[in-house]
Design a protein with these regions (language model features):
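N-terminal "mature-domain start" segment
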Residues: 29-67
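Surface-exposed amphipathic alpha-helical segments
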Residues: 48, 53-57, 156-182
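Short, solvent-exposed coil/turn segments at beta-strand boundaries
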Residues: 55, 74-75, 128, 151-157
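Bacterial N-terminal signal peptides that target proteins for export
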Residues: 1-13, 17, 21
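A short, solvent-exposed beta-edge/loop patch
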Residues: 133, 144-158
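Signal peptide processing junction and immediate N-terminal pro/mature segment
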Residues: 20-31
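Solvent-exposed loop/turn segments connecting transmembrane beta-strands
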Residues: 60-63, 140-142, 167-170
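Conserved polar/disulfide-associated segments of primarily extracytoplasmic proteins
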Residues: 64-145
Length: 182
């Protein structure tokens, strides 16, 4: 899988994070990534979800919503993390969560007509209710494993997208376990 094709694909997926009113993920990424570091510590959902990524390049996607793409050049895995205001106006927390889940599924399908959902479930992670959507995609011949994780906390929505080559299901699963603290 070509790094440039994967990066182009991940940048196009940023539209998934446009779940709240005026929040858009117009990519404002600089052309230069940060240097590959030994570790990148990630803290999300008000500190309730923390994980460490090793050997990744970090690219800021949108400072308004805190979007960052972490790219592992060794495995060619991309992880996109975005936080922004939750779509909660006039709704209960449960209704807002359901609206966000439905919107995420719709946006995922709209981003690529070749996306195929393989499973979806709601799980508990560190006291957070988290929606998980797994699937596969074929984007211009690139066969990808996809996982979308979404949670809401303190009027913020957090979305994590994990994209890996279909040839690396073990690495894809390990990346998800790392993020979920399992």
């Amino acid at each position: 899988m070509s790094k440039h094709l994967l990066l182009g694909w991940t940048l196009s997926l940023c539209v998934l994070t446009a779940l709240s009113g005026s929040a858009t993920m117009a990519v404002a990424a600089s052309s230069n990534a940060t240097a590959v570091s030994d570790t990148q510590s990630v803290s999300l959902a008000g500190g309730k979800l923390n994980f460490v990524l090793e050997g990744v390049e970090a690219r800021i996607l949108n400072s308004e919503n805190g979007g960052t793409m972490y790219f592992d050049p060794k495995s060619e895995r991309a992880i996109i993390v975005t936080e922004g205001p939750a779509p909660t106006a006039g709704t209960t927390p449960d209704a807002a969560f359901r609206i966000a889940v439905d919107t995420l599924k719709d946006k995922q399908q709209a981003a690529s007509p070749n996306f195929r959902m393989t499973s979806e479930k709601t799980i508990q992670v560190n006291g957070l209710r988290m929606y998980r959507l797994d699937g596969t995609d074929d984007f211009n011949g690139l066969k990808l494993l996809m996982a979308s994780l979404m949670t809401m906390s303190d009027q913020k929505i957090t979305i994590i997208e994990v994209m890996s080559s279909e040839n690396d299901p073990t690495g894809h699963t390990a990346a998800l376990k790392n993020i979920l603290g399992k």
